[in-house]
Amino acid sequence: MAEKSGWAKRAKQPGRGMGIAAWFCHLGYFAEVADVSVDASGKVTVNHVWAAGDVGSQIINPQAAESMGFGGVIDGMSEMGQEITLAQGRGVVQSNFHNHPILRMKQVPPIEVYWRKTDYAPTGLGEPTLPPILPAVTNAIFAATGKRVRTLPLQKSGFSWA
């Protein structure tokens, strides 16, 4: 991830930062780096995302695997901007994308996905790309602003998607 994202050469600019997060899931290791910009009003733009995972010994369909990586990142970023509302005694209020939308195309950054093949048994690769994007982005926001995001959605911490 360090090489692909240019981590060692990242510039120290006000309002710009990179963050990393990693985790172990489905018998594989996954890491993501996010590069973000934050303006004076707290509007966050994710400029680029790099995602990588150790998914075992074989990938049957590389194009589908890459698409699943994209989907996990986009879905995870979407969850950062809103929360699920529960109505007492009725369950979840949101019923579909009209009242719980995913990111719009203009908000989706360039995403690079890399899979590392190892001698381990094949593992899942779609779902494990979702969780690390949340701390990768919030760590990047901290690098850009000095302010930690400890509560989601972003609006609860004074930020929102640009």
Regions found by a protein language model. Name each.
Residues 32-36:
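Short beta-strand scaffold segments in enzyme catalytic cores
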